[in-house]
Amino acid sequence: YMEGCDRLDMSVYADCFVVGGLAMYAAQTETPDVYEFAKRLYDSILDRVKRNDYQTLPYPLSKKLRAHGIPMILSNITKDIYQASLKYDSDYCNTALKNMEGFTGDTLSHFVDPDGCLHEVITAENQFFDQVLGNHINPGHTLEDAWFMLDTAELTGHAEWNETIVIVNHES
């Protein structure tokens, strides 16, 4: 419990980890009901993120800022949903791929500066800012996201992203 926060969904990140785990479980078993639950929670996450109505505890962030962690984790769990949808919901596969493409495109277009550094935090208007949070880069996060971005590039046919992803990881 956190004083002043009476929401049950205190961390969109926690919900994302649930989706990822359940989607991968469903993909490896015969549990369509688990896939359906994961997909409903996934859709709820996308809706909350789109409306900017979500929490990131224990790492609260002002609504005036955007965290790289959001498109990063969404790219990852969307791949998990995609893999499960191959088994249970082939009509959803293209939607999942488009979502992955959007999250990776967002990261490469907005969080990577002209020098190839991937910033952890930018403004809500997709601008870099010269303060501690705005200058923060996390090489481990950058490397982890490279894995997700390379998966997306392969699945969505964006081979041209590979060079940018490699440069980002070299510079960060």
Language model: regions and residue ranges:
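Glycan-recognition and catalytic cores of secretory/periplasmic carbohydrate-active enzymes
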Residues: Y1-S172
